[in-house]
Amino acid sequence: MPLYEHVFISRQDLSNAQAEGLIEHFSTVLADNGGKVVDREYWGVKTMAYKINKNRKGHYAFLKSDAPSAAVQEMERLMRLHDDVMRVLTIKVDKHAEGPSIQMQKRDERERGDRGDRPDRGDRGERGGFRR
């Protein structure tokens, strides 16, 4: 079966549980039509570059699937009809990348927040202030 990756954005006023419920719902739609979800990720609420339906932010979700095209078309149709889903993007891939997506890796790096040892900045001089 072909491999697909899906990203969808849902409205910002949904709770995290409702957004994750949408992921579960669309995973079930794929399973009911003969496909399977290989991996799913909830990326959280992110600010968008421009407003969509008067929303500046949205809940982002990412699915990796192994499904026939009919199952993907049905899932996309239901996503576009769903009032809470603002945007959908589906791409066909040759193979799924191993491990977490780039977005999740960025989030893990941000959560660590470790800046390490900062070396003493010797170029400032001992006075600290402006040099003339």
From Swiss-Prot:
Any GO BP annotation: translation
Disordered: annotated segments: 96-132
Molecular function GO terms recorded: small ribosomal subunit rRNA binding; structural constituent of ribosome
Pfam families to which the protein is assigned, alphabetical: Ribosomal_S6 (PF01250)
Record keywords: Ribonucleoprotein, Ribosomal protein, RNA-binding, rRNA-binding
Superkingdom assignment: Bacteria
Gene Ontology cellular-component terms listed: cytosolic small ribosomal subunit
Listed Basic and acidic residues bias regions: 105-132
Family: Belongs to the bacterial ribosomal protein bS6 family.
Known role: Binds together with bS18 to 16S ribosomal RNA.
Name listed for the protein in its UniProt record: Small ribosomal subunit protein bS6
Species whose genome carries this gene: Cereibacter sphaeroides (strain ATCC 17025 / ATH 2.4.3)
